[in-house]
Amino acid sequence: MAPARAGCCPLLLLLLGLWVAQIPVSAKPKDMTSSQWFKTQHVQPSPEACYLAMSNISKYIEWCKDLNTFLHEPFSSVATTCQTPNIACKNGHKNCHQSSGPMSLTMCELTSGKYPNCRYKEKHLNAPYIVARDPPQQGDPGYPLVPVHLDKVV
């Protein structure tokens, strides 16, 4: 009797689950390595206004990203962070590293709009950050380890 009471709901839930699974968790462009995409999304040595900086990201993913943080230092400095002692990431993996001190950052938070007209408020701060790292892939700079994910602003 239980299956009869369930009706179409299990099928609907299955179809909904399959549809949601098609949405990419990481909208990394196919022609970029994880490190190159990290650099595009998060490394900005010279601060830019959020609306301008985020439009560069939106053109790849074709939607308005809810929140993004830019690190105002060269990629080489962020890559050096990958040489600090390992710490646990938010997901429990042990491939994260914290910056040696506070760094200049800009956080861009979506306030309204639909792609391509995304509107953001920006918050400037100095804070340490935590990045996840991996070995470089073909096409990445020649560092022993490269940042691939901004895990947290501390």
Swiss-Prot record:
Its main location: secreted. Transmembrane segments: none annotated. Residues 1-27 form the signal peptide. It is found in: Secreted. Gene3D superfamilies: Ribonuclease A-like domain. Disulfide bonds join C64-C118, C89-C96. This is Ribonuclease 8. The lineage of its organism: Eukaryota, Metazoa, Chordata, Craniata, Vertebrata.
